[in-house]
């Protein structure tokens, strides 16, 4: 019996290692993208780390809140040699999330309508978005 266990132990161990999920230690997600429709509605998504490390030298994104209470999202996205600028002001429902967006280090998606009102803000956090 001991001989059989000794024979099968390496096989079972190898099978367990192969079946184990990957830990993804050190994995980082860096993405950045913005678009604008013909009616000036549009959206941006990615992470602030992704915008900072984007290959376009003029690419950036930030959430702002002034002392007066005014809130804005501003971004620039460079594709090739063309930089396009984006901005929106949150509506009442989206403005509630602004304090979270100000400290957010993960993935975000923000959409705005043709009048420039941010009507949707999606925030997703995870270790793969942080630069530790």
Describe every region a protein language model picked out.
Residues 2-11:
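Bacterial N-terminal signal peptides that target proteins for export
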Residues 27-42:
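Short N-terminal segments immediately surrounding and downstream of signal-peptide cleavage
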Residues 48-78:
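N-terminal, post-signal-peptide region of Sec/Tat-exported proteins
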Residues 84-97:
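Beta-strand/loop nucleic-acid-binding surfaces
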Residues 94-109:
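Short nucleic-acid-contacting surface segments enriched for D/E, G, S/T with interspersed K/R
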Residues 115-132:
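OB-fold/S1-family single-stranded nucleic acid-binding modules
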């Amino acid at each position: 019996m001991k001989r059989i266990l000794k024979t099968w132990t390496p096989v079972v161990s190898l099978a367990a290692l192969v079946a184990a999920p990957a830990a993804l230690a050190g994995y980082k997600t860096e993405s950045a993208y913005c678009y604008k429709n013909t009616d000036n509605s549009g959206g941006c998504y990615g992470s602030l780390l992704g915008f900072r490390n984007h290959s376009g030298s003029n690419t950036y994104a930030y959430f702002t809140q002034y002392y007066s209470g005014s809130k804005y999202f501003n971004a620039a996205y460079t594709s090739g040699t063309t930089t396009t600028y984006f901005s929106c002001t949150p509506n009442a429902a989206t403005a509630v999330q602004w304090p979270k967006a100000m400290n957010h280090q993960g993935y975000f998606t923000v959409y705005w309508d043709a009048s420039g009102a941010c009507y949707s803000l999606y925030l997703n956090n995870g270790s793969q978005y942080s630069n530790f």
